[in-house]
């Protein structure tokens, strides 16, 4: 059984995973029930698992092709090993995502569900209503990256954190730490470091602006 999580931590995770699935205007989101958010979150994870396993299968096929040519070229063996290792890493990622699918319902049973729903919807509504302002803050804190080129999950983790800091009165440290934890669960190996760096710059920028007021 997973460890107990705070309602807001569960809400952030559900908001992140349901964001791409839940549509509609901000005022319509208030009618969304928790089971709809959960279904959207599970669909997102299922889609991620499917895509990851497809990539893994592709790497295995490429490795097999390289091995078939390996009788005359030793370099092909090395290349095949690299592809096989990549496929194994992708498979591990898919297994981790599958674990998250199983954990989410358990997390909900261990926490206060009305708080989870309310805060998840507050995040989603804020992201809809304040999208341009949130994007502007993130865009101004990126180094050698463009907002629209960010991986979707990384971009959404940043959006949630900035929305919390700007509009939901979440302390900087809490918003950053929670975003880093989400990145550790759902981003790639270096994702949490990237998220942490961007949000530190966001924090520095916003604090500097506040000091001038």
UniProtKB/Swiss-Prot annotation:
- Quote the InterPro entries the UniProt record gives: NusB-like_sf, NusB_fam, NusB_RsmB_TIM44
The record's keywords, sorted A to Z, are:
RNA-binding, Transcription, Transcription antitermination, Transcription regulation
Q: What Gene3D superfamilies does the record point to?
A: NusB-like
Under SUPFAM superfamilies, the record lists: NusB-like (SSF48013)
Gene Ontology CC entries for this record? cytosol
Q: Would you say which domain of life the source belongs to?
A: Bacteria
Q: Which molecular function terms from Gene Ontology are attached?
A: RNA binding
Q: Write one Pfam family the protein is assigned to.
A: NusB
For this entry, list what GO says about its biological process: DNA-templated transcription termination; transcription antitermination
Q: Which residues cross the membrane?
A: none
Q: Which residues form a coiled coil?
A: none
Q: Which PANTHER family match?
A: ANTITERMINATION NUSB DOMAIN-CONTAINING PROTEIN, N UTILIZATION SUBSTANCE PROTEIN B-RELATED
Q: What does this protein do?
A: Involved in transcription antitermination. Required for transcription of ribosomal RNA (rRNA) genes. Binds specifically to the boxA antiterminator sequence of the ribosomal RNA (rrn) operons.
Query: Which family does the entry's similarity section mention?
Result: Belongs to the NusB family.
* Annotated NCBIfam families: nusB
- What is the recorded name of this protein? Transcription antitermination protein NusB
What species does this protein belong to? Picosynechococcus sp. (strain ATCC 27264 / PCC 7002 / PR-6)
